[in-house]
Amino acid sequence: MDLAANEISIYDKLSETVDLVRQTGHQCGMSEKAIEKFIRQLLEKNEPQRGPPQYPLLIAMYKVLLTLGLILFTAYFVIQPFSSLAPEPVLSGAHTWRSLIHHIRLVSLPITKKYMPENKGVPLQGREEDKPFPDFDPWSSNNCEQNESEPIPANCTVCAQILPLKVTLPEDTPKNFERLRPLVIKTGQPLLSAEIQSFSCQYPEVTEGFTEGVLTKWWRCFPERWFPFPYPWRRPLNRSQILRELFPVFTQLPFPKDASLNKCFLIQPEPVVGSKMHEVHDLFTIGSGEAMLQLIPPFQCRRHCQSVAMPIESGDIGYAGAAHWKVYIVARGVQPLVICDGTTLSEL
């Protein structure tokens, strides 16, 4: 009301001023056109300016909401790093060996006697305690009906020779790399949760399946990495160096120098064990969790060769020539499985 009354009084005064100017112009002998022009210029220069509308209540609510938003945003970043992480997987394989005996023949393997529940506390006979892991022969002649008169294809001669899968420790690994022989090395050196998280921050291009919010990952990786996400303008990675950086034990193993890492991916436990198989290249490492290794010969070789199945666990390194085997990993157990897939070839 006050504003409206003020505007009315202003326009009344302007009207009086216009009348006074008009009278003065006539007295001075000015023409009507000149008087109108002078009045128009006067009104344009002295037009009353209306100030911006004031809404104090709305402005106060806006400030309160903005303050609350900043407080919640800050609290999210402060609380998120202390949220509980998934439990770190533990090396364990004793409870699954019994159910796998009918798939593979591990009777002569010392590690079987170590983990079999019925043999706990029973010492190994003779001098077998001092022997390295023997060759693991999962083939069974009773299950393989091979026609001797049928010629063996050239690309099937390797698996048809029934070379056993060699299970060994790092210190017992052959000095020379054998490309034709499947190999499993029991290092007993799994990846810790902190190592996996640091690796995913430093090399996001070679990690997959680690589902995590954008803000959560950024906060966890800061300040070690300002932008922990893959971007196209980054220079190519030295994947051979990354493999040995993540698994230093490779510097002591006889694999080629150009052996490299393709990708590390996380697999959650399947509702039904063995329901999903994950194919990898010729070289792989189990970072954490438990799995079943399956080596399957090419389709044209299955009349002459048989598949291989063996349980593997955290820290195990496996190799099988890609020209003679298809390598599959099947998750088992209740812990998430971290697989690092690599190759001994110069190109993936």
UniProtKB/Swiss-Prot annotation:
Record GO cellular component, one term: midbody
Post-translation changes: Glycosylated.
Signal peptide, first to last residue: none
Domain of life: Eukaryota
InterPro entries the record matches: BRAP
Localization (cell): Golgi apparatus membrane; Cytoplasm
GO BP annotations, alphabetical order: autophagy; chromatin remodeling; collagen metabolic process; connective tissue replacement; epithelial cell proliferation; fibroblast proliferation; positive regulation of cell cycle; response to bleomycin
Entry keyword Transferase: no
Membrane topology: Single-pass type II membrane protein
Extracellular domain ranges by topology: 80-348
Annotated keywords: Cytoplasm, Glycoprotein, Golgi apparatus, Membrane, Signal-anchor, Transmembrane, Transmembrane helix
Ranges that cross the membrane: 59-79
Cytoplasmic side, ranges: 1-58
Task of the protein: Exhibits histone deacetylase (HDAC) enhancer properties. May play a role in cell cycle progression and wound repair of bronchial epithelial cells.
Subunit comment: Homodimer. Interacts with BRS3. Interacts (via N-terminus) with SIN3B.
PANTHER family linked to this entry: BOMBESIN RECEPTOR-ACTIVATED PROTEIN C6ORF89
Protein name: Bombesin receptor-activated protein C6orf89 homolog
Species assigned in the record: Rattus norvegicus
